[in-house]
Amino acid sequence: MPPMQARTLSVYNVMVPLVCLLLFFSTPTHGLSDSEAILKFKESLVVGQENALASWNAKSPPCTWSGVLCNGGSVWRLQMENLELSGSIDIEALSGLTSLRTLSFMNNKFEGPFPDFKKLAALKSLYLSNNQFGGDIPGDAFEGMGWLKKVHLAQNKFTGQIPSSVAKLPKLLELRLDGNQFTGEIPEFEHQLHLLNLSNNALTGPIPESLSMTDPKVFEGNKGLYGKPLETECDSPYIEHPPQSEARPKSSSRGPLVITAIVAALTILIILGVIFLLNRSYKNKKPRLAVETGPSSLQKKTGIREADQSRRDRKKADHRKGSGTTKRMGAAAGVENTKLSFLREDREKFDLQDLLKASAEILGSGCFGASYKAVLSSGQMMVVKRFKQMNNAGRDEFQEHMKRLGRLMHHNLLSIVAYYYRKEEKLLVCDFAERGSLAINLHSNQSLGKPSLDWPTRLKIVKGVAKGLFYLHQDLPSLMAPHGHLKSSNVLLTKTFEPLLTDYGLIPLINQEKAQMHMAAYRSPEYLQHRRITKKTDVWGLGILILEILTGKFPANFSQSSEEDLASWVNSGFHGVWAPSLFDKGMGKTSHCEGQILKLLTIGLNCCEPDVEKRLDIGQAVEKIEELKEREGDDDDFYSTYVSETDGRSSKGESCESISFA
């Protein structure tokens, strides 16, 4: 071989392996698939809750894993809450999730310094509250995170100054730093925040002028802070006071004049307002055959009327101005989108204007908003649910989650027909259920002169609820509590008393603080004791609902009046024998039913087991409920296990017609 060729071959033999080696070691983590990246991330975790991440395995796609939410097949949210997690957070592994936008590790046991989250530059929401992170957060910890909107670091052990980079985030909307040990002064924020909590730290110095109109509670527990809105402005040792003799005469001389002027102005405004309203009422007065709240009630109560009216006003103004019409209308259309987004293709389409023109009747209101029945001009009846506390996800995440819920199809679910997105509030449009909620049928029928639910109807409702809940657990495996808010007011009844679950799958959307205060899942024993939610949390909700259906007792009454809850009240009165005082008198007299009722009571108590490990899972609960019958069969010997020898009664041939629930 010629020397030149030999040298060339020698160089080739050396360079090719070297280049391959360099390529191997320089391959970034983001070359991994989502599945590989998450499994790599899992290796850095210590999981305290048994089987919490059992679904995380290569045999199934990551979008079906617990706590993993996807958008278009890519992972956009990891919701790892209440799992007793510790160890470290592998940022390099997470950087392989190129579509990741939300991280939540709240209510776990992570320790150590603040992870280098700035490597996840596309992140929009970061929730680390209620852990044990500590130490100073570097000033540049949030540099380059231009998309970050929500930062929740409450109830940790962070020290040092608030990082300057967090105050400079251009899109920041929420910042919770309460319950830490931050020191130094509060930085100037780039713009107004929707949510800010700096309470219970060791902050000092003046409150920035941009925060002078903030609720004082935001700054509670920081003894060294002064300035508006705190009352300690003039008593702070950190500022030099002017002589009080100079300030007081000026204040005292102007005070009465200012107050008089304000009172006079308010009086004039009130008088003008009353005259305007009376005049408008007179002009618009028309006879109607609508429901009691009138045609504009939905507009007023949903807050859409003003936006819609302003749009019409702009159109009129543009029409009068002539040449500027096209430009202004185009601009208005670009800013304001009043179109409903439909999730069901099998329904007759209508638009927001049809809803605004509809006669409306308020059905009820709760912690998250209110519900209205809207009767469209076609005669179609819809329910519009208004949510004001649904800002835990951005527009894209919200729409993707709505599509996921819209794909659910089961005869025991109330389908979401359409939705309307506004930054301030959201509207969900559903079908109208003729008999209203289970809560009304259980607790208000007698006072309204309507018949109570009998045993066969109650059993039918329990079976339907269980089936619907099981379906949710099968089709929403990534949610820790697929329903999350199961209670009697969130079960609606059709004309034939078929139950329909509603308000399911909303935990990822509801503001975290409000969810923890009001949603049913956060009242479970595991959350109250260990600050965690599990797959069996919905089962606990099912158990409480079963006990409510059988006893007629409203669960909320127990938490308000005593430390005892409904499950412990039933347990204290149930000794394995028939106890009429436990059951709702409204069930009346039925035939051959005691054994089946006691079976269901036992299932309900097993679903309410405080120890999560001993509690039934949803599959076991559904299987046992499906075995129940309206009346005893000849082959059923269950009742004998609940009848004491001294009682002497048997379900065989015994008619429940003689049983009184009084």
Curated annotation (Swiss-Prot):
Receptor-like kinase involved in the control of pollen germination and pollen tube polar growth. Glycans are attached at residue 197. ATP binds at residues 363-371, 385. Disruption phenotype: No effect on pollen germination and growth. Prk1 and prk2 double mutant has no effect on pollen germination and growth. Prk1, prk2 and prk5 triple mutant shows reduced pollen tube elongation. GO terms for cellular component: apical part of cell; apical plasma membrane. This is Pollen receptor-like kinase 1. The gene is PRK1. The modification Phosphoserine is found at residues 359, 437.
